[in-house]
């Protein structure tokens, strides 16, 4: 098998093969040039990346840190990878690409040579086997005619007896010419036969075999070029593998349990002996009746001691109950973290558990603080009980022996002194009757401690990361206040207050580990707010604002981040990722997250959807479960709708869906939109992609991120950054005027999507083309197999004048009637 033996008559095929291979080589050359450019840019990008790394972050700290070492080595090895990639690009340019360029020239020369030689030998063969023989044959025929003519004239001459010799001579001459040409023709024919045989058996096969040999040599050369290309560009070469091995080895050196051992050794401090807290005996220098560390039980304190004992007992019981609750919460959270850890598919999934682990540590701190409070209360209670039990059944002794004093004073003086002591006693009794006054400063301290132990997120007046505008809507009366996390600056907290007819916002300063406005600093925000609320101290002297009424958050919708466990990623929305999640009671949910780096206005739009959905309860509208705004990132928790988005559902199930089911889907959307219309809600983004397929194929409207609720039922927009043009009514596109009528237009498009089984509206048109065509009066034709009644509804929805479009109540009635007709 070969070119010479099998391709003798395949000249055109050989030429096409050579042309194709030349085009292929040009493509390979272009690809290699782009690869070189790409590798050089990649090398430059890597180097630039390393150069931009904060140099301080790569400087070794003053203790041995494997994390720091690993990070430094990552940067160094990335620089090494940059150098390797740059070298590879240069080698690729000087090696395979250069040789490929030379090979293309050689390939062109081989083709040129083949074409030239083939034309030459083919022309020679045609000349010998056809052209020359045809000439001889033509002369042959001519000479036969001449000889026959000479013979006729000779016969005529013999018959007449005139010029016989002359005629004979002419006849002999013509015969000689013919015979000589005959011999020449016989020889030429023999030569042509041999030439043709040589052409097809030797000359042409030799040329074709020569071409095949050069083709194969070039394939061999190309293979060598490819081999060298593969070797140079390989990402598993020893030098590149070593780079990644070095990085992996440095990562493996990181041991969380020993990472800070050296840091501890470097910064270890000798524990200072704590100063013992003792009774200041100097307080007793001017009073001989009081004793250090002794409870005074007398006629002035006996009643108050009983009340104090009762209060301490209640506080101890309450603390112990809280402790049991917190300890149970610790065990529950530990269990959840352990279960979540087992489901982690990737090593980096541990990051998803950090929030829960931090919450666990905070819970443990809370437990420890409660144990401390429990111990203090128990000790104080024991001290009081001991004193009360010692004097059980006894009459409390008087503070002053008035009978002895009476010997040295007049009766008038005695009355005055009795009066003074009675007033003191009544004052104390008044204090005792007021529970808030029990224990005096000791109880106030206890109150502060209990406030401090309660995490910020658990206080009713803390609303989390709600938008400023939403906070302002909640403040309506003088002194109304709440605390929120700044939406624009996560980690910064703001006090929002209604004062003197305006809403004021005060950033809570955090300086020297203390929270304050401009006065006293506190170790946490609850203590700061509690101080200003209880003392009625102004927030700032300049503002004169006083806290009067804490505004509680709506607990129906508020969830803590710890209440939700994130699972698999379901997809990405306009504002962030959407995860499958699980509540504490194992309820599956969908969790929409908001990226922390989004602009302020987009974060507000993100929460707008939750604000709208709080008001709605309908089987054809996706349900809101709650919001997590206590910290960033903010979550919106929705019911998990298992069937996914309607558009994908239509496209996947298009071969299974029957007409009746499509009408039922349409009726579901109409029912949901009828409900929204009654609530003056304008959806503005009604489309198949924004509906979800629930259980029993119930369709639910979702994605209220662009929705607005307007009392007048009309919303004007100065412009949206992303408008779904093919779904949006003309008046909304042209004038920014949105209404339920513009939602009806979108409903018509959704109907078209439904009955076309997921085809994109205005097929073959760009957004701009579709918009221009609609303005000219164009409307889409009915989808294949779409009932005439359904298409009639679509056309009504697409009336250019909003006032002529049907209401959702009309659409619901019509679709209900159509559904009944279909069996």
From Swiss-Prot:
- Taxonomic superkingdom: Eukaryota
Role played? Tyrosine-protein kinase that acts downstream of cell surface receptors for growth factors and plays a role in the regulation of the actin cytoskeleton, microtubule assembly, lamellipodia formation, cell adhesion, cell migration and chemotaxis. Acts downstream of EGFR, KIT, PDGFRA and PDGFRB. Acts downstream of EGFR to promote activation of NF-kappa-B and cell proliferation. May play a role in the regulation of the mitotic cell cycle. Plays a role in the insulin receptor signaling pathway and in activation of phosphatidylinositol 3-kinase.
Q: Which Gene3D superfamilies match?
A: Arfaptin homology (AH) domain/BAR domain, HR1 repeat, Phosphorylase Kinase, domain 1, SH2 domain, Transferase(Phosphotransferase) domain 1
| Keyword Glycoprotein (UniProt) | no
Subcellular location, record wording: Cytoplasm; Cytoplasm, Cytoskeleton; Cell membrane; Cell projection
**Membrane topology listed for this record:** Peripheral membrane protein
Q: Which positions does the record annotate as the modified residue Phosphoserine?
A: 434
The Protein kinase domain covers 564-815
F-BAR domain: residues covered: 1-259
From the broadest rank down, the organism's phylogenetic lineage runs:
Eukaryota, Metazoa, Chordata, Craniata, Vertebrata
**Which parts form a coiled-coil structure per UniProt?**
123-185, 301-382
Pfam families tied to this protein: FCH, PK_Tyr_Ser-Thr, SH2
Q: Where Phosphotyrosine occurs along the chain?
A: 402, 616, 715
A GO CC term assigned to this protein in UniProt: cytoplasmic side of plasma membrane
Matching entries from InterPro entries are given as: AH/BAR_dom_sf, F_BAR, FCH_dom, Fer_F-BAR, Fes/Fps/Fer_SH2, Kinase-like_dom_sf, Non-receptor_tyrosine_kinases, Prot_kinase_dom
Q: What's the name of the protein?
A: Tyrosine-protein kinase Fer
Q: How is it modified after translation?
A: Autophosphorylated.
Q: Which family does it belong to?
A: Belongs to the protein kinase superfamily. Tyr protein kinase family. Fes/fps subfamily.
Which segments constitute the SH2 domain? 461-551
- Spell out the molecular function terms from Gene Ontology: ATP binding; epidermal growth factor receptor binding; lipid binding; non-membrane spanning protein tyrosine kinase activity; protein kinase activity; protein phosphatase 1 binding; protein tyrosine kinase activity
What note about domains is in the entry? The coiled coil domains mediate homooligomerization and are required for location at microtubules. The N-terminal region including the first coiled coil domain mediates interaction with phosphoinositide-containing membranes.
Q: Subunit details for this protein? A: Homotrimer. Interacts with IRS1, JAK1, NRP1, PIK3R1, PLEC and TMF1. Interacts with PPP1CA and regulates its phosphorylation at 'Thr-320'. Interacts with CTNND1, EGFR, FLT3, PECAM1, PDGFR and STAT3. Interacts (via SH2 domain) with CTTN. Interacts with HSP90; this stabilizes phosphorylated FER and protects FER against proteasomal degradation. Component of a complex that contains at least FER, CTTN and PTK2/FAK1. Interacts with ARHGDIA.
**Sorted UniProt keywords:** ATP-binding, Cell junction, Cell membrane, Cell projection, Coiled coil, Cytoplasm, Cytoskeleton, Kinase, Lipid-binding, Membrane, Nucleotide-binding, Nucleus, Phosphoprotein, SH2 domain, Transferase, Tyrosine-protein kinase, Ubl conjugation
Catalytic reactions of this protein: L-tyrosyl-[protein] + ATP = O-phospho-L-tyrosyl-[protein] + ADP + H(+)
Q: What residues does ATP bind to?
A: 570-578, 592
Main localisation: cytoplasm
Task: Give the record's GO biological process terms.
Answer: actin cytoskeleton organization; adherens junction assembly; adherens junction disassembly; cell adhesion; cell-cell adhesion mediated by cadherin; cellular response to macrophage colony-stimulating factor stimulus; cellular response to reactive oxygen species; chemotaxis
């Amino acid at each position: 098998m070969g070119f010479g033996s099998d391709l003798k008559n395949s000249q055109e095929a050989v030429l096409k093969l050579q042309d194709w291979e030349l085009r292929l080589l040009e493509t390979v050359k272009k690809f290699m040039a782009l690869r070189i450019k790409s590798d050089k840019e990649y090398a430059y990008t890597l180097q630039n990346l390393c150069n931009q790394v904060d140099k301080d972050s790569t400087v070794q700290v003053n203790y041995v840190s494997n994390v720091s070492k690993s990070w430094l080595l990552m940067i160094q090895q990335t620089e090494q990878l940059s150098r390797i990639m740059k070298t590879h690009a240069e080698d690729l340019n000087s090696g395979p690409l250069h040789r490929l360029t030379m090979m293309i020239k050689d390939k062109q020369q081989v083709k040129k040579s083949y074409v030239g030689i083939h034309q030459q030998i083919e022309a020679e063969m045609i000349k010998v086997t056809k052209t020359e023989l045809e000439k001889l044959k033509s002369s042959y025929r001519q000479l036969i005619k001449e000889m026959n003519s000479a013979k006729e004239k000779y016969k005529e001459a013999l018959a007449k007896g005139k010029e016989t010799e002359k005629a004979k001579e002419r006849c002999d001459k013509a015969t000689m010419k013919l015979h000589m040409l005959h011999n020449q023709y016989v020889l030429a024919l023999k030569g042509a036969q041999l030439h043709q045989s040589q052409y097809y058996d030797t000359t042409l096969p030799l040329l074709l075999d020569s071409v095949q040999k050069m083709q194969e040599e070039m394939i061999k050369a190309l293979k060598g070029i490819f081999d060298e290309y593969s070797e140079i560009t390989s990402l598993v070469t020893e030098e590149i593998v070593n780079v990644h091995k070095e990085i992996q080895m440095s990562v493996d050196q990181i041991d969380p349990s020993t990472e800070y051992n050296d840091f501890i050794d470097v910064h270890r401090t000798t524990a200072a002996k704590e100063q013992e807290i003792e009774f200041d005996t100097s307080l007793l220098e001017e009073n001989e009746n009081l004793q250090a560390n002794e409870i005074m039980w007398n006629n002035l304190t006996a009643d108050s001691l009983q009340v104090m004992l009762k209060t301490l007992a209640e506080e101890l019981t309450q603390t112990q109950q809280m402790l049991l609750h917190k300890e149970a919460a610790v065990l529950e959270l530990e269990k959840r973290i352990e279960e979540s850890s087992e489901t982690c598919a990737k090593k980096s999934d541990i990051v998803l558990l950090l929030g829960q682990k931090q919450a666990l540590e905070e819970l443990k701190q809370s437990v420890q603080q409660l144990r401390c409070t429990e111990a203090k209360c128990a000790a104080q209670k024991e001290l009081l009980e001991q004193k009360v039990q010692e004097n059980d059944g006894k009459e409390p002794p008087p503070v002053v022996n008035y009978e002895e004093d009476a010997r040295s004073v007049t009766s008038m003086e005695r009355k005055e002194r009795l009066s003074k002591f009675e007033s003191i006693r009544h004052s104390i009794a008044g204090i005792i009757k007021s529970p808030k006054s029990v224990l005096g400063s000791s109880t106030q301290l206890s109150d502060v401690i209990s406030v401090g132990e309660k995490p910020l997120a658990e206080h009713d007046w803390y609303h989390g990361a709600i938008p400023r505008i939403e906070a302002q809507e909640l403040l309506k009366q003088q002194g109304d206040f709440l605390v929120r996390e700044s939406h624009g600056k996560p980690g910064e907290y703001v006090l929002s207050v209604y004062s003197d007819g305006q809403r004021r916002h005060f950033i809570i300063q955090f300086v020297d580990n203390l929270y304050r406005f401009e006065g006293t600093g506190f170790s946490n925000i609850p203590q700061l707010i509690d101080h200003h609320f209880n003392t009625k101290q102004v927030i700032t002297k300049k503002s004169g604002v006083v806290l009067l009424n804490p505004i509680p958050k709506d607990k129906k919708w508020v969830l803590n981040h710890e209440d939700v466990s994130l699972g698999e990623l379901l997809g990405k929305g306009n504002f962030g990722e959407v995860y499958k999640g699980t509540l504490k009671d194992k309820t599956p949910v969908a969790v929409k997250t908001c990226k922390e780096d989004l602009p302020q206005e987009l974060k507000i739009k993100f929460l707008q959807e939750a604000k709208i959905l709080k008001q709605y309860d309908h089987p054809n509208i996706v349900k809101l479960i709650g919001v997590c705004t206590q910290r960033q990132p903010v979550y919106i928790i929705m019911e998990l709708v298992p069937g996914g988005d309607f558009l994908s559902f239509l496209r996947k199930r298009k071969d299974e869906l029957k007409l009746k089911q499509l009408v039922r889907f349409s009726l579901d959307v109409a029912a949901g939109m009828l409900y929204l219309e009654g609530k003056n809600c304008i959806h503005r983004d009604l489309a198949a992609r924004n509906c979800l397929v629930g259980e029993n194929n119930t369709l639910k409207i979702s994605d209220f991120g662009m929705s607005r609720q307007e009392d007048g039922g009309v919303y004007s927009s100065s412009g949206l950054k992303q408008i779904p043009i093919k779904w949006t009514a003309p008046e909304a596109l042209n004038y920014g005027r949105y209404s339920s009528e513009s939602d009806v237009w979108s409903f018509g498009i959704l109907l078209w999507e439904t009955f076309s089984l997921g085809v994109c509206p205005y097929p073959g048109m760009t957004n701009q083309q579709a918009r221009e065509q609609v303005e000219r009066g164009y409307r889409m034709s009915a989808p294949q197999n779409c009932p005439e009644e359904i298409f009639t509804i679509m056309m009504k929805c697409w009336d250019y004048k909003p006032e002529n479009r049907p209401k959702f109540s009309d659409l619901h009635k019509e679709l209900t009637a159509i559904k009944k007709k279909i069996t």
